[in-house]
Amino acid sequence: MARIRSFNLDRWSEPDETPVLFVAVCQDESLPGCNDTDTGLALANMTDAAWAHGVGSCIMGAIDRPAIKELLGLGENLRLHSVVAFGYPTHKSHLVAMQNGNVKYYLDDARDYCVPKRPMEEILLKTL
C-alpha cells in the first residue's frame, strides 16, 4: 500500500478499483533531442493501444516525482515525465467546465470522474 500511496491513489480508489499496472514514463536527458513531443506520442500510442483491448488508462502528471523516482531507483539522467495507470474501467469519465481555474478531478455522486477542462472559446486563438 505504501507504494500505491506514492501515486496518491488511495484517496481515489476502492480496493477493487486499483489499477492493475503503472508505467513510469521517463525521458533520458543524456540523449540529444529528447523532448515532450516524443513522449506525448508514446503516451498516446500506449493509451490508444490499451483502449483497443478494453483497458482504460489515466495519464498522471500531477505526481510526487521525487518520491516516485526514489521508489523506482531512477538515475539522475532520467526525468520522470508522467505515470500512466492502466486498468479495467468501473466508472465513466465526463468532461466538465473548469471553474475558477481549478483543474482537479473529482468524483460525482455516481462515483464517476469529472475532468475539468477550459471551454473552446478560451483556448482557440481564432476561428475561420
Where are the predicted features?
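Acidic, surface-exposed loops and disordered segments
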Residues: M1-L128
